[in-house]
A protein has these predicted regions:
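Non-catalytic C-terminal accessory region of glycerolipid acyltransferases
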Residues: 2-37, 130-275
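Membrane-anchoring hydrophobic helices of lipid-metabolizing enzymes
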Residues: 2-88, 93-119, 123-126, 194, ...
């Protein structure tokens, strides 16, 4: 086929995709105002991820078409990769995912309504179990703010002895799906590892540390195999099992230590690490 023919096919595909997206948004607003708002933001985030990070997601088929699952992920300095993941879920799967966020976000003026619209909860186990028993997906990062601030380009998991998320999965009788995004630490980096900011967080639990970045590095999100519900496993055992699964994704898909220049060049790499 000629170059002109290829360009025509590409433009036709883009026009078709744009038409379908517009129809989806129109239908969403007709059905529900908040649903329309969610899909509009999802479309914007999806476009941003594609343009700025060449965002890819591998293993999306492991997310159930319906029914609950607990998605456990590594927390970057700014979890922008998680927003791209949520957008992809809405657009490609037609599903929303409830998310657990640190309580300090709910104290930001004017932010609470936005969090409620996007089904963000501050994490009591009972509320998490309720969301899963109602058939929703639920995303949580056991490392939370601590991992966001104090982890670095060597990608250590800072979960401590946290096992509440595992107890939630057991009580809800749902599978756990591990998730990790390649180069998320190269997109944004935190200076929380510096002794002063570490002391502030450890002593006063103040999530205050300079963050720099916004670099257009390659982002690839990888979903691991679901860990099925096991009635005979303890929360501590499941927590360890999930941590090993997330660590396995890091080992397989992330070059350690992370490097910003290399992550930028990976925008031009056809095959991800581990493939």
């Amino acid at each position: 086929m000629s170059n002109t023919g290829n360009q025509s096919c590409l433009m036709g595909a883009e026009d078709t995709l744009s038409f379908l997206r517009k129809n989806q948004l129109r239908e969403a607003y007709c059905n529900n105002l908040w649903d329309g708002a969610r899909k509009t933001l999802a479309t914007l985030w999806d476009g941003h991820g594609a343009i700025w990070h060449g965002y890819e997601i591998h293993g999306l088929e492991k997310i159930p078409v319906e029914g609950p699952a607990l998605i456990v992920y590594y927390h970057g300095a700014i979890p922008i990769d998680y927003y791209y993941f949520l957008a992809t879920l809405i657009i490609q799967k037609g599903r929303t995912c409830h998310s657990v966020a640190d309580h300090f976000l709910f104290k930001i003026p004017g932010f609470k309504l936005l969090l409620e619209v996007f089904s963000v909860i501050h994490g009591p186990q009972e509320e998490c179990v309720r969301a899963l028993r109602n058939g929703h997906l639920l995303g949580i990062s056991p490392g939370g703010v601590r991992e966001a601030l104090l982890s670095d380009e060597t990608y250590p998991l800072l979960w401590g002895k946290r096992k509440g998320f595992a107890q939630v999965a057991i009580d809800s009788q749902v599978p756990v799906i591990p998730m990790f995004t390649q180069n998320v630490r190269e997109g944004f980096r935190s200076l929380g590892t510096l002794s002063f900011f570490r002391w502030l967080y450890e002593r006063f639990r103040l999530p205050v540390a300079p963050i720099y970045g916004g670099f257009p590095v390659k982002f690839r999100t990888f979903l691991g195999d679901p860990i099925p519900y096991d009635p005979n496993i303890t929360a501590a055992e499941l927590s360890e099992k999930v941590q090993q699964a997330v660590q396995s994704l890091i080992n397989q898909h992330q070059r350690i230590p992370g490097n910003i220049l290399r992550a930028l060049l990976e925008r031009f790499q056809l095959k991800p690490k581990g493939h």
